[in-house]
Amino acid sequence: MSAFFAERALLPSGWANNVRLEVNADGVLTHIQADSHADGAERLSGPLLPGMPNLHSHAFQRAMAGLAEVAGNPNDSFWTWRDLMYRLVGKISPDQLGVIARQLYIEMLKAGYTSVAEFHYVHHDNNGQPYADPAELALRISQAASSAGIGLTLLPVLYSHAGFGGQAPNEGQRRFINSTENYLKLQSRLQPILAQQPAQSLGLCFHSLRAVTPQQISEVLAASDKQCPVHIHIAEQQKEVDDCLSWSGRRPLQWLYENTEVDQRWCLVHATHANPEEVTLMAKSRAIAGLCLTTEANLGDGIFPAVDFLAQGGRMGIGSDSHVSLSVVEELRWLEYGQRLRDQRRNRLYGANQPMVGRTLYDAALDGGAQALGQAIGALEVGKRADWLVLDGNDPYLATASGDGILNRWLFAGGDRQVRDVLVNGQWVVRDGRHAGEEESNRAFTQVLRDLLG
């Protein structure tokens, strides 16, 4: 058992002072007591917060962050960005993927993300053929997460088609494509391996309605664990909505709700172009809206109607997706700022009994992220995994703030530099802003970039 003492900590009931926390050998919180003592405990150096789950990641895309910011096409969009992504993914080896993912996860930890849902759809070799072990690349992701020390929900993706109605895949998608049968075999191969890994679990994932058929969705759901998370990209771009209407006469979210039992297991990634009726369906189903603000802005996707969704009790979380940014602060700040820009008003996302915008944003992302990852995380609470971050207690903004003002100061006037220490599964992974493996990881990652882009 390890004991820790925080002068200020954000508990489910709110901010508390002089909090003693005890963690067992399995990395689980076993005791939390406010107004307690520090006897025999490690003193934490600043405000203590639950670690943030990152509910949407494509690890390999970190290698191309910043490469698509070159003007030239007046109609530049997600679809033109995708062409660059296809060219990059065609080159990456298993070793390179492992290096990229480890670097990414270290950077996430330093920003305050303590777990990640990896939406993993690169399955095959550069020619589109399965590896000797079809789980080769998925296992590289698991190994990278273990090496970095981040929690992981691995989401192997079923990706079979290039468009609605079962269109044949194109050459750029050759590394992604699986049949339903092979996808279920991949799940079976990974399940016992991840079950032995601390802080790792497995979920289901459909790339999008355009990449799978209705029959495939039904078959996978029928053959799988009824408790595990289910993730899908949906309604990210207007073109996707238009194409779905042409195929089915229904919008993507409308089609999904009419043809599938969507419940709290589901994470609807992006859902950018949800209309009012679909927003209501999402909120009532208690599915998670997986919002990736910096990526959606980078791709020019649009703005999710978060004010209306939150007002109806909707649940949401954040993800860094293409990793143009790896900042908890940026994702939450732009979740709020996007609504302000759309509505031309300030302070848009807050609760009926919670006027502090920072607290509303942080709580929503904790709860939604934990639900989307399907793990016992997202709160400093007995029985949950000991995942947390310690902010810099010497920072002037934080040292002079109290209660929920700490979150407002951090999220709207601060940044990643204020994340001092990070603990995952009861183990320190970042101390004084540094990860023990970052120097070696930086060197390896630099070489991979030179090899891929040179």
PLM features: what roles do these ranges have?
Residues 124-271:
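Metal-coordinating catalytic core of metallo-dependent amide/deamination hydrolases
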Residues 1-37, 47-48:
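N-terminal metal-binding scaffold of metallo-dependent hydrolase/deaminase domains
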